[in-house]
Amino acid sequence: EGTGKATINITGGHIGIDGTDGGVVYGSARGEADDRYVMAHHAFVKESEVNVKYPTTADVADISDTSVGCITGAVHGSGENGYGYGDTHVTLHKGLIGHSLYGAGKGIGKYKKSIPILAGDNKGTLKEREIYGLLSGKVLGNTYVTMNDGLVVRNVYGGGNMTTRSEERRVGKECRS
């Protein structure tokens, strides 16, 4: 326990600058990728809800105009390397998202670990490798993505960007026009 629900309501403003790294909205915490057997503390929330409801949907041609309300990057229901312990709810009521819409988070964090070589002349020799964090951006509950109106320039995903899963989960997706 000890964690609550994170709720984000976006109703105006310009988030990010087109053509740069940034402009991304995350529904939960930013965590640290590390070996799950070594690192006992990860950043997470119990449940997250992200609502994007601009008054109007901007035109894609205006995405670099900072006076126009939009999100230039992606929207994630969970965190960047942090994870959601329960469910995520992501709803696009109206507005422009310049990248993709994800029900879960982004698992881009890596850590280094020495792993034995399994075959060949160097069998048993340890080699250092970069490994993506097992819980990075993951949602342990269900993801719910609803798009009532608006524009997503790239894709809509029920899951996350480079996240993992340890068991089969039901992903609820709903798209209305």
Q: Which ranges hold each PLM region?
A:
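Surface-exposed loop/turn motifs in large extracellular/passenger domains
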Residues: 1-155, 161-166, 170
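A short, hydrophobic C-terminal helix/tail in secreted or cell-surface proteins
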Residues: 169-177
